[in-house]
């Protein structure tokens, strides 16, 4: 019978040399375990070595006896007794006796060889002699003072580990006191020349120090800008100068460093957010260039974080009126330092909205918008406005709006109105316009498979598929920002804004924030949901009727109401007559004796109420408003008169039948009632615009030009037509152009150069010769010096008066 053949295949050479992953891992673990055990052994040896050295130092050596000195009698007797009790030498073996002699000569009382280079727990070999090690230990008299050993890092060579130590002499108290006295003397010597410096020398020395610091800052900044990846560590060196301790230049140097670091971060920061690396990314092998980039990003983020923490600490110390222990910077100078820190934070808020820690900057800036210091508050508000204006996507704006809304609610609506006025700079309106255009121009629709099968051949379908694929890829490449994401962010932002506005309308109607709220509602009213229109109009009318609002606040209410009605509110059946009546009766509140700040709001309201709602405005209402605007133009400042006359011109073009106000003939429908508060029933058709004749003699040339133009019927052509720079501008633009807020007259007043010259007669001024002679005689004569006697003159005059009375 055949022997059974082994079916196992002989392993190949490749399999023999191949090592499994488990084996490799086990090998690695064993290697690490051995290294750890070796380290533990080494630490144990070092611990024992230090303990042995301490024991050897702490033992007090017995001083050697002088053979010449006489020993005391008692000690001699005790030694004799010990000798008697000791084992006699004749009873010991020769080997033991020889060993005792050797031990006595070789000083075997030490247990360890301190000078040996071998480890403590080294294995003993047979050929080594234990006694020979102890001979290496020196025996010296301790006549010198005790010295403490400082243990250093050991050295390892072929023979083993060599411990290293250094002696530290024990200093006495007297030596320490002498050293302190020497230091004090040196300090006094150093301080003496400083006190002797004059003011001029002190200023020169400060300039020199400051110049050196400026050169150092410039050198570091230039090195970082030249190659940020290689010199990222110099950011730390530059940031360390924020802790300048020299009181002469501390404030200036810190300000320069803050500004320099801010500009550096704006220049070298990448245009993306740096995220922390995962464990898997850290463990993978990468190229040198990638590793260098990672190190740069990590260093940049860490230094940027520390820089922001330093700025936050400066602002916090200033707010809490704290000073550092060193007292290098005074409290007065700390305010300027804090303002520079706030300015840097504002710059970073605007310049780096995409980078790390942007939300942290927002949390720092928003409370400072409500700060008691006006420069700081204005600086922060301007930075937030700038961020809103340039934020295209809306991510940064949403973060700021969330923090502001929470801050206003947390302060119970007791904040500066400027905080809410920043909402007016949001770019939500522009996105809505883009959305409308995208709805009109819908994207191209691709053909379905069934449509392709019906109309195209097999080859055409293949080409069509490839073409559609390319079009999709091109569309994805061109779309840099997602419109859907943009609309989503702006919708969320708008919801938070309206929630803040409605809270203030509901809970804080007497708050100084109300004008800002009404102004914001007027701007974003077209974006409010239609469901809230009725309730919002009722609230606005209630606020107007309450009488607690100022004139400008009531105008904001009117403007908001008509913005609501001019947008989606066209579909609602709401009669805004009460708002027309309120504006008509309050127009005469404006006059030249007060500031004309409300004129701009009035011009906006008239544009929304009359020009844009021309189909809903009756003929009688248009006539009444034109008559009242011309009357108002007589009692306001020139720029306000120009704006009102420009609005009158637009209304005369919008409502052509209003030219009957230029005739002096009246109709038989009644008498004009100028004091009536209802514009519909004041019979404005029975009056004329006599105010224009008065305005033709106004001292301002532009007012005169507009008055003449309106009297001629506001023609578009001819001699009475306006110039293009006047006719093409809106009423608000003309009001701002000819404003005299800068205390300058526009157009400038021409200096009068009269051609007539005053003629003087040669010789005497008077033609009468007798009069000239009399004047010369009295001018040449010297006046007699007579004393003044008022009593005598009074008696003579009274006596003369009596005589005249009797006669």
UniProtKB/Swiss-Prot annotation:
There is a cross-link at residue 332 (Glycyl lysine isopeptide (Lys-Gly) (interchain with G-Cter in SUMO2)). The gene is Noc3l. This is Nucleolar complex protein 3 homolog. InterPro entries: ARM-type_fold, CCAAT-binding_factor, Noc3_N, Nucleolar_cplx-assoc_3. Residues 40-51 have a biased composition (Basic residues). It comes from Mus musculus. The keyword Glycoprotein does not apply. One of its GO terms (biological process) is fat cell differentiation. Residues 449-489 form a coiled coil. Keywords: Coiled coil, Isopeptide bond, Nucleus, Ubl conjugation. Residues 52-78 have a biased composition (Basic and acidic residues). Residues 27-93, 167-191 are annotated as: Disordered. Induction: Induced between 1 and 12 hours following adipogenic stimulus.
């Amino acid at each position: 019978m055949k022997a059974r053949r082994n079916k196992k295949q002989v392993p190949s050479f490749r399999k023999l040399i191949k090592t499994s992953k488990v084996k490799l891992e086990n090998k690695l673990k064993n290697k690490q375990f051995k290294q750890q055990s070796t380290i533990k052994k080494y630490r144990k040896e070092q611990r024992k070595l230090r303990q042995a050295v301490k024991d050897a130092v702490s033992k007090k050596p017995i001083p050697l006896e002088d053979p010449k000195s006489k020993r005391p009698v008692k000690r001699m007797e005790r030694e004799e007794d010990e000798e008697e009790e000791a084992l006699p030498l004749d009873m010991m073996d020769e080997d033991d006796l020889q060993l005792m002699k050797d031990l006595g000569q070789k000083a075997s009382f030490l247990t360890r060889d301190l000078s040996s280079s071998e480890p403590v727990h080294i294995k003993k070999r047979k050929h080594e002699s234990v006694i020979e090690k102890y001979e290496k230990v020196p025996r010296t008299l301790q006549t010198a003072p005790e010295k403490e050993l400082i243990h250093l890092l050991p050295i390892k060579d072929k023979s083993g580990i060599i411990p290293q130590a250094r002696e530290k002499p024990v200093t006495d108290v007297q030596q320490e006191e002498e050293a302190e006295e020497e230091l004090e003397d040196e300090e006094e010597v150093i301080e003496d020349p400083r006190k002797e410096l004059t003011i001029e020398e002190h200023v020169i020395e400060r300039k020199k120090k400051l110049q050196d610091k400026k050169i150092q800052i410039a050198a570091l900044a230039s090195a970082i800008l030249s190659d940020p990846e290689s010199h990222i560590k110099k950011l730390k060196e530059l940031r360390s100068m924020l802790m300048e301790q020299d009181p002469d230049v501390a404030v200036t140097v810190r300000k320069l460093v803050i500004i320099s670091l801010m500009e550096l971060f704006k220049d070298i920061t990448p245009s993306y957010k740096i995220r922390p690396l995962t464990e898997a990314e850290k463990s993978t092998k990468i190229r040198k260039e990638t590793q260098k980039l990672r190190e740069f990003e990590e260093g940049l983020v860490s230094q940027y974080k520390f820089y922001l923490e330093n700025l936050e600490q400066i602002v916090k110390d200033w707010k809490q009126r704290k000073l550092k222990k060193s007292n290098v910077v005074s409290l007065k100078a700390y305010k300027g330092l804090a303002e520079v820190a706030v300015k840097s934070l504002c710059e970073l808020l605007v310049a780096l909205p995409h980078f790390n820690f942007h939300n942290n900057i927002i949390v720092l800036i928003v409370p400072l918008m409500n700060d008691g210091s006006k420069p700081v508050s204005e600086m922060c508000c301007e930075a937030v406005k700038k961020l809103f204006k340039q934020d295209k996507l809306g991510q940064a704006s949403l973060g700021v709006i969330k923090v502001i809304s929470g801050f206003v609610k947390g302060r119970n609506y007791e904040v500066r109105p400027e905080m809410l006025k920043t909402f007016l700079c949001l770019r939500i309106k522009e996105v809505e316009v883009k959305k409308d255009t995208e709805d009109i121009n819908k994207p191209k629709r691709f053909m379905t498979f069934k449509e392709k099968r019906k109309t195209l051949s097999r080859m055409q379908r293949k080409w069509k598929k490839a073409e559609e694929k390319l079009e999709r890829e091109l569309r994805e490449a061109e779309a840099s920002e997602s419109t859907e994401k943009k609309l989503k962010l702006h919708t969320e932002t708008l919801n938070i804004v309206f929630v803040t506005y409605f809270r203030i309308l509901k809970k804080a109607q007497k708050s100084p924030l109300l004008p800002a709220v009404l102004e914001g509602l007027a701007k974003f009213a077209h974006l409010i949901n239609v469901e809230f229109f009725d309730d919002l109009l009722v609230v606005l009318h209630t606020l107007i009727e309450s009488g607690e609002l100022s004139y400008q606040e009531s105008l904001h209410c009117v403007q908001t109401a008509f913005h609501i009605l001019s947008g989606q509110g066209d579909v609602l059946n709401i009669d805004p007559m009460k708002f027309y009546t309120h504006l008509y009766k309050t127009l005469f509140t404006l006059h030249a004796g007060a500031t004309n700040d409300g004129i701009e709001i009035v011009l906006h309201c008239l544009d929304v109420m009359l020009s844009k709602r021309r189909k809903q405005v009756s003929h009688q209402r248009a006539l009444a408003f034109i008559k009242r605007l011309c009357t108002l133009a007589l009692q306001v400042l020139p720029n306000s008169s120009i704006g009102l006359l420009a609005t009158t011109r637009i209304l005369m073009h919008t409502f052509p039948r209003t030219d009957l106000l230029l005739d002096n003939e009246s109709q038989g429908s009644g008498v004009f009632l100028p004091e009536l508060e209802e514009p519909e029933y004041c019979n404005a058709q029975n009056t004329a615009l006599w105010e224009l004749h008065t305005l033709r003699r106004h001292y301002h040339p532009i007012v005169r030009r507009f008055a003449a133009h309106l009297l001629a019927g506001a023609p578009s052509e001819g001699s009475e037509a306006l110039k293009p720079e006047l006719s093409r501008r809106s009423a608000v633009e003309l009001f701002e152009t000819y404003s005299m807020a800068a205390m300058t007259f526009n157009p400038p007043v021409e200096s009068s150069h009269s051609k007539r010259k005053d003629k003087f007669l040669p010789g005497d001024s008077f033609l009468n010769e007798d009069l000239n002679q009399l004047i010369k005689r009295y001018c040449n004569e010297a006046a007699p010096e007579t004393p003044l006697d008022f009593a005598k003159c009074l008696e003579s005059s009274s006596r003369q008066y009596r005589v005249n009375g009797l006669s």
